[in-house]
């Protein structure tokens, strides 16, 4: 007869789970043994659950999150009791804040020891009650395992969030109750979930159409909730002669080669997106929870319509005239027949001019030579030229995200993600590995900085060594912008707080990630001079295995937002006057960038 652990793993298999990310420990010995037995039992069919051993449980949760983001399936992570469970939390909050389905399974002290301050005993119900608020259960009886698993999986998929199961150590070895009795006080649950079609009431669709039809300068903003609706968005935009900006999590929703797509919005966004938001008279938000009001239109001058599958997000960021509760694709397909075909192309012509102006400014700023390394804009422009059509790109928190947001252009078929809501450091490398495991035929590219690599990315290169031999196309590329600085923090302090660079806080040791990659048997290239950049990138994309391209970039190249404010300029000046150790260089480089942008606009 099967144990509880064996039944639980087979139940996950019945739900379609084929990969679990985790790290072993004696609090989950029963589950680890069950995974191995399951693997042996399914050896001939070839559809066994694959256990991916990571270097740290946080990265297991990151990988489960990435798996859910890129495949649409449930991500599953596994950790032992106490410290292992604690380590999962940051990655689980990444999943929760970006609204993707992840199930966490964690061990616990034996039932007979709970409450006795036993070794590695932690109050996991309290620890997980926020991150897994949708469904959190400590399993205490074999008869409750079936419905516990079923509800945890269905809850994660249905609510697109995190759920968690806690399994005491002794329960894992008990005999399973695969079919609970048909009696009172037992639950007989089943496997299966099909996501529903959420559509607004016809009356509300007509109200939304009336607002959009009345507008002459319609701007669309899409987020991750619009993934999979590209054709419907294009049709609606063409009907309205609208332009479209993208929140960062929605960067891959639409290809950037469409002339009316302005790119990303916000501090990391483009000039064209900012200008469109300032000049539109109507705003249509689709599947986005973009939080930065200063980059949205003035709400007293613009009419708004929003589409979102989560009713709690409707009207949260902008006082819309019409809020449509519905899934993006289904709602847009019903809305399209109600929209009138606009023929005036002047608004799109204005958007195209802003796009061209932004391109000229970026090109002019990219021609500025770095004083302490390579201009990071050069790195990302050259990287963009080499992106394969079906690649998967992951990004980290930091200045590497700023540059990739502006300079990496999406095409149809590409995938992209990062930690959006949580904006945590460290997910780019585990995200890329999870993406490669899910799509071995695609090139996976992680864009990160030296800070995030030193935090946890470098450890997961060891994990990669364990699995890289599996893939038909073994290319997975790590682009590391090494500026020897926690540069995002440095610039935020300069521009927001008027505080100078604080070396003890922000400066990083210059540790070569490329050299570490070579220790693992991968290709590792360290680019110190601009003339080495193009050959290194060409070699990376031609390689037949994992590659780390470490580029020494200039930390003093400023990241001017598209609408830099007088307050930011004043704060920046204060930081320089307070004795920023890089003040003279930063000021000189910033003046060059401002002048380059001014001359580009004047041409």
Name what the model sees in each region.
Residues 174-177, 253-256, 314, 360, ...:
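Short acidic/His/Gly/Ser-rich catalytic and metal-binding motifs that mark active-site loops
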Residues 5-8, 13, 26, 31-35, ...:
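Active-site diphosphate/adenylate-binding microenvironment
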Residues 23-26, 51-62, 77-83, 140-141, ...:
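Active-site nucleophile and cofactor-binding loops and adjacent substrate-binding regions
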Residues 143, 167, 190-191, 210, ...:
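Phosphate/pyrophosphate-binding active-site segments
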Residues 149, 354, 534-537:
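Short, well-structured alpha-helical segments that form the helix of a local strand-helix-strand
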Residues 1-342, 386-389, 443, 468-478, ...:
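N-terminal alpha/beta PP-like core and its mobile active-site loop of ThDP/TPP-dependent enzymes
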Residues 7, 59, 378, 459-462:
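Active-site phosphate/pyrophosphate-handling residues
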Residues 105, 113-122, 315-317, 323-325, ...:
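Thiamine diphosphate
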């Amino acid at each position: 007869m099967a144990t509880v652990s064996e039944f639980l793993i087979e139940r996950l298999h019945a739900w379609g789970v084929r990969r679990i990310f985790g790290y072993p420990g004696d609090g989950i010995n029963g589950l680890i043994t069950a995974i191995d037995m399951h693997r042996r039992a399914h050896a001939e069919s070839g559809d066994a659950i694959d256990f991916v051993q990571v270097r740290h449980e946080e990265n297991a949760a990151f990988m489960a999150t990435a798996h859910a983001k890129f495949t649409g399936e449930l991500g599953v992570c596994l950790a032992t009791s106490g410290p292992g469970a604690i380590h999962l939390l940051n990655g689980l909050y990444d999943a929760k804040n970006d609204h993707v389905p992840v199930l966490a399974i964690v061990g616990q002290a034996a039932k007979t020891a709970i409450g006795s301050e036993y070794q590695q005993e932690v109050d996991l119900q309290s620890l997980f009650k926020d991150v897994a608020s949708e469904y959190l259960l400590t399993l205490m009886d074999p008869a409750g395992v079936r419905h516990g698993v079923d509800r945890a999986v269905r809850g994660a998929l249905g609510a697109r969030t995190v759920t968690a199961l806690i399994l005491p150590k002794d329960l894992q070895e008990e005999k399973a109750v695969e079919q609970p009795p048909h009696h009172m006080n037992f639950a007989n649950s089943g496997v299966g979930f099909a996501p529903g079609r959420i559509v607004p009431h016809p009356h509300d669709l007509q109200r939304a159409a009336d607002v959009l039809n009345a507008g002459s300068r319609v701007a669309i903003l899409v987020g991750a909730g619009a993934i999979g609706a590209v054709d419907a968005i294009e049709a609606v935009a063409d009907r309205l002669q609208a332009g479209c900006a993208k929140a960062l999590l929605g960067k891959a929703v639409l290809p950037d080669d469409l002339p009316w797509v302005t790119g990303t919005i916000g501090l990391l966004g483009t000039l064209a997106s900012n200008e469109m938001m300032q000049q539109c008279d109507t705003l249509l938000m689709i599947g986005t929870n973009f939080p930065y009001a200063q980059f949205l239109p003035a709400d007293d001058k613009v009419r708004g319509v929003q589409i979102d599958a989560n009713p709690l997000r409707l009207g949260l960021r902008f006082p819309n005239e019409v809020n449509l509760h519905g899934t993006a694709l289904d709602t847009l397909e019903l809305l399209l027949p109600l929209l009138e075909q606009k023929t005036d192309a002047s608004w799109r012509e204005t958007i195209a001019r802003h796009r061209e102006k932004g391109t000229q400014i970026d090109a002019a700023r990219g021609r500025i030579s770095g004083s302490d390394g390579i201009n990071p804009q050069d790195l990302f422009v050259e990287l963009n030229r080499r992106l394969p059509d079906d690649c998967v790109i992951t990004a980290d928190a930091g200045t590497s995200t700023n540059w990739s947001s502006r300079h990496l252009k999406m095409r149809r078929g590409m995938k992209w993600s990062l930690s959006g809501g949580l904006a945590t450091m460290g997910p780019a490398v585990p995200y890329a590995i999870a993406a490669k495991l899910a799509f071995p035929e695609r090139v996976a590219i992680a864009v990160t900085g030296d800070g995030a690599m030193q935090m946890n990315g470098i450890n997961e290169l060891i994990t990669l060594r364990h699995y890289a031999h599996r893939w038909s196309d073994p290319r997975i590329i790590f682009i590391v912008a090494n500026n020897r600085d926690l540069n995002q923090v440095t610039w935020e302090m300069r521009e927001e707080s008027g505080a100078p660079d604080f070396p003890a806080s922000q400066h990083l040791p210059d540790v070569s990630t490329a050299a570490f990659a070579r220790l693992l048997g991968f290709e590792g290239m360290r680019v110190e001079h601009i003339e080495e950049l193009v050959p290194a990138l060409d070699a990376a994309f031609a390689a037949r295995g994992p590659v780390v391209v470490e580029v020494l970039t200039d930390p003093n190249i400023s990241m001017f937002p598209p609408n830099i404010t007088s307050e930011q300029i004043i704060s920046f000046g204060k930081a320089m006057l307070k004795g920023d150790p890089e003040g003279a260089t930063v000021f000189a480089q910033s003046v060059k960038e401002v002048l380059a942008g001014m001359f580009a606009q004047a041409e």
